[in-house]
Amino acid sequence: MSIRVLIADDSAVMRDAIARTLNADPALEVVGEAASFAETLKQASTLNPDIVLLDLHMPDESRYLPEIVKGPLLENTGCILAISVWNDEEAKSLAKNIGAVALLDKAHLSSDLISSIKMYCMKD
């Protein structure tokens, strides 16, 4: 049985790169992609992914991020991994507030993604 992943990033190029990386591992299955927080909430509630890879900064963040912080995303997924181009204290705090288990730097995503998923989200 594969681990179901929802990719949430406003960049189609980034979503495609992440999907290619994940699809190279037979234990992982990309079940959906979202380009906004609104889409992420909707898809998470219908797809019930095991993992959500969530970009912290998308165009509709001011409207939906407070809603995400309240926890509805966690109700529909087992693990949130935040991704961002920023790794400052503000980003780390935001990742923690939304219930993410870790904040991954987009600059190192290709080398860190699979190992981070296995470390933080895959239970034996």
Label for each model-derived stretch:
Residues 109:
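Receiver (REC) domain switch/active-site region of two-component response regulators
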Residues 62-76:
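Short amphipathic alpha-helix used as the core "switch/output" element in two-component signaling
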Residues 63, 86-104, 115:
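Alpha4 helix (beta4-alpha4-beta5 surface) of REC/receiver domains from two-component response regulators
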Residues 2-14, 18, 22:
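Conserved acidic segment of CheY-like receiver
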